[in-house]
């Protein structure tokens, strides 16, 4: 378990195509999507928080800090990443933050270690996950030293595209393979009801 890197779950994504509310709180298996994410992400990292706006009480049973955006206007995942960096700088000894999307229940069990290894070989760079040739910009290791540049990018330039900032800052990609036994992309995410049903089937097959 890493103690030198903080983890942030970007948990405030809305399920507009699924009736509203937080995608991370949708039911999955015996718990929620977020329960499943934390069962895989939590053992990798000691210092962990949730990024979400609105009433933090809806996440109270998880026992984790809930970080509201420090940038106004619901500026998307990049605002959550910035807030996570600011929280890590102000309240932890960590020099980097690993983020994970709150709608991706099968994230890799070695996500943090592999991103950290890549970042160690490329000091100052953002280490970002990819699979099958596709980059997953919300699954990345962000050095705390990029905080000021990120705030300028988001606030002063009003650019909310995560990939644009990654390209500008400098990055290294880390390829994660599909889970061969299930043919599963570890970054499979839930956007529509069919995705949630598929996630339930996959989870059942993995635990049976």
UniProtKB/Swiss-Prot annotation:
Where is GTP annotated to bind? 10-12, 23, 69, 103
Alphabetic keyword roster: Cytoplasm, GTP-binding, Magnesium, Metal-binding, Molybdenum cofactor biosynthesis, Nucleotide-binding, Transferase
Name the EC number(s).
Answer: 2.7.7.77
GO CC terms of this entry: cytoplasm
Is Metal-binding a UniProt keyword of this protein? Answer: yes
Which Cys pairs does UniProt list as disulfide-bonded?
Answer: none
- The UniProt record gives the binding positions of Mg(2+) as 103
Biological process terms from the Gene Ontology for this record are:
bis(molybdopterin guanine dinucleotide)molybdenum biosynthetic process
Tell me one Pfam family matched here. Answer: NTP_transf_3
What GO molecular-function term can you cite, just one? molybdenum cofactor guanylyltransferase activity
* Cofactor(s) essential for the protein: Mg(2+)
Q: Which InterPro entries match?
A: MobA-like_NTP_Trfase, Molybde_CF_guanTrfase, Nucleotide-diphossugar_trans
Which locations, inside or outside the cell, does it occupy? Cytoplasm
Q: What is known of its domains?
A: The N-terminal domain determines nucleotide recognition and specific binding, while the C-terminal domain determines the specific binding to the target protein.
Spell out the family assignment given in the record's similarity comment: Belongs to the MobA family.
Q: What does this protein do?
A: Transfers a GMP moiety from GTP to Mo-molybdopterin (Mo-MPT) cofactor (Moco or molybdenum cofactor) to form Mo-molybdopterin guanine dinucleotide (Mo-MGD) cofactor.
Quote the protein name from its UniProt record: Molybdenum cofactor guanylyltransferase
Q: Which organism is it from?
A: Mesorhizobium japonicum (strain LMG 29417 / CECT 9101 / MAFF 303099) (Mesorhizobium loti (strain MAFF 303099))
């Amino acid at each position: 378990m890493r103690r030198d890197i903080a983890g942030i779950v970007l948990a405030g994504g809305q399920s507009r195509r699924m009736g509203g509310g937080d995608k991370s709180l949708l039911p999955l298996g015996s718990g929620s999507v977020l329960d499943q994410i934390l069962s895989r992400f939590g053992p990798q990292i000691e210092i962990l928080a949730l990024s979400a706006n609105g009433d933090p009480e809806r996440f109270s049973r998880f026992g984790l800090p809930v970080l509201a955006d420090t940038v106004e206007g619901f500026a998307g995942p990049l605002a959550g990443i910035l807030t996570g960096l600011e929280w890590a700088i102000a309240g932890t000894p960590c020099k980097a933050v690993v983020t994970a999307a709150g709608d991706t229940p099968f994230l890799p069990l070695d996500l943090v270690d592999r991103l950290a290894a890549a970042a160690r070989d490329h000091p100052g760079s953002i280490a970002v996950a990819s699979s099958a040739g596709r980059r997953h910009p919300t699954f990345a290791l962000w050095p705390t030293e990029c905080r000021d540049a990120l705030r300028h990018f988001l606030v002063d330039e009003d650019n909310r595209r995560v990939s644009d900032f990654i390209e500008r800052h400098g990055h290294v990609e880390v390829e994660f393979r599909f889970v061969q036994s299930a043919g599963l992309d570890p970054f499979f995410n839930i956007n529509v009801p069919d995705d949630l049903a598929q996630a339930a089937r996959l989870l059942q097959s993995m635990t049976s």
